[in-house]
């Protein structure tokens, strides 16, 4: 397996461009199944999860091509295999996103129960119960979800728990359902609004995305479209934390700051100077020491669970005590054991990490366990004394585009070691 070798101690400085958002791109690719026309997607990030999603719809019969401007063109009009096989689904939980599109467009879907990051229970039962309310017949057999429907019918659906992918799945399914569907207790993440924008550009009638209630008036068919994937707020947040922990000064371009309110606010509480305009964010941590910040993850617009591992590293080198409480997913502190091997002082108490700040940490060989945990280990390597080797970096390649290249451009000493 490839590894990353990091020599710590360099302050980050300079500018980078933010990549397209994986969490916006994956549902958009899944939603392309709803149209029989050509779909052109711009600003797709080069990530393993994107490749896996293309392999998934390609295995069903989708036609996928890349033009001279590096835009992807998709056509799913001739899907002949309505099964998402375990070999692909096991590597990525977001593969469940094709369920709503397939049953709405083709009346049938067979999808292996999903895999992906090993961070606890992410139940798909919210998706399945909601699809049943639209009239789908759902069965679970031999590790596969099987869904059938002659025609989905609009309904009033209140999710039992807030679910991003569940909200997205139902938005897709309801777009081709007969009549009005109302979704409540929905996720409000920016990527929900992105999916609504994409579907509406295809002719869907969706309103309320980003609010407490989403209304979808079903239509007969959806057309082709051209859509640009928005920038990745989690990638931007990760690089801002990287600059903060290295007492650096950076600017991230091509990012909408309004999507990052809680991240920016938390960085400011930690002592960073953060400025933004309509298309960039600048952070300066050269004038102050890090102040630890208590964090509780929450659905958007609260603090994102996908940033808690990175801010845990920030708190580790702040002066004093702090806590990070995870309310979204189980088992999302698997990076803590590896961080403690580098000299941090973190104790887990249930769903809370109790952190005592330390003066310094030391490089070590560490192992990534999931996507955001791997990001935290890289951040720790940037500030550690000596060399850090991060193993199993296939996790990082699922969600960060060319991370070693971008960090190197900001002054970090980091290289990828071959197998």
Question: What feature does the model see in each segment?
Answer:
Residues 1-419:
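Short, structured segments at the rim of ligand-binding sites
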């Amino acid at each position: 397996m490839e590894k990353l070798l990091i020599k710590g101690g360099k302050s980050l400085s300079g500018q980078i461009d933010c990549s397209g958002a994986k969490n916006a791109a994956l549902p958009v690719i899944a939603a392309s199944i709803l149209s029989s026309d050509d779909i052109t997607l711009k600003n797709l990030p080069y990530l393993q999860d994107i490749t896996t999603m293309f392999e998934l719809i390609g295995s069903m019969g989708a036609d996928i091509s890349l033009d001279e401007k590096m835009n992807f063109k998709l056509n799913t009009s001739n899907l002949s295999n309505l099964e998402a096989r375990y070999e692909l689904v096991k590597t990525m939980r977001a593969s469940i996103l094709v369920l709503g599109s397939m049953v709405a467009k083709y009346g049938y879907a067979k999808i292996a129960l999903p895999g992906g990051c090993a961070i606890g229970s992410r139940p798909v039962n919210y998706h399945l119960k909601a699809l049943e309310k639209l009239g789908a017949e759902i069965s679970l057999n031999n590790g596969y979800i099987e869904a059938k429907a002659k025609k989905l019918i609009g309904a009033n659906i209140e999710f039992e728990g807030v679910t991003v992918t569940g909200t997205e799945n139902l938005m897709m399914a309801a777009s081709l359902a007969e009549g009005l569907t109302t979704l409540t207790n929905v996720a409000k993440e920016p990527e929900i609004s992105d999916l609504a924008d994409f579907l509406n550009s295809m002719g869907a009638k969706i309103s309320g995305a980003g609010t407490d209630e989403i209304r979808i008036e079903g239509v007969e068919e959806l057309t082709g479209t051209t859509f640009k994937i928005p920038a990745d707020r989690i990638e931007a947040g990760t690089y801002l934390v990287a600059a903060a922990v290295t007492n650096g000064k950076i600017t991230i371009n091509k990012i909408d700051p309004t999507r990052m309110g809680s991240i920016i606010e938390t960085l400011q509480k930690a002592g960073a100077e953060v400025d933004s305009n309509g298309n960039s964010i600048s952070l300066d941590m050269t004038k102050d020491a890090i102040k630890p910040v208590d964090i509780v993850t929450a659905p958007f617009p609260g603090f994102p669970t996908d940033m808690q591992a990175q801010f845990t590293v920030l708190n580790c080198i702040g002066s004093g005590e702090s806590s990070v409480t995870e309310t979204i997913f189980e088992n999302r502190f698997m990076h803590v054991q590896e961080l403690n091997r580098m000299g941090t002082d973190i104790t887990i108490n249930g769903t809370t990490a109790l952190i005592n700040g330390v003066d310094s940490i030391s490089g070590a060989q560490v192992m990534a366990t999931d996507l955001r945990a791997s990001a935290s280990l890289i951040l720790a390597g940037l500030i550690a004394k000596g060399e850090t080797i991060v193993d199993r970096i296939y996790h990082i390649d699922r969600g960060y585009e060319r991370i070693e290249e971008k960090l190197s451009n900001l002054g970090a000493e980091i290289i990828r070691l071959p197998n």
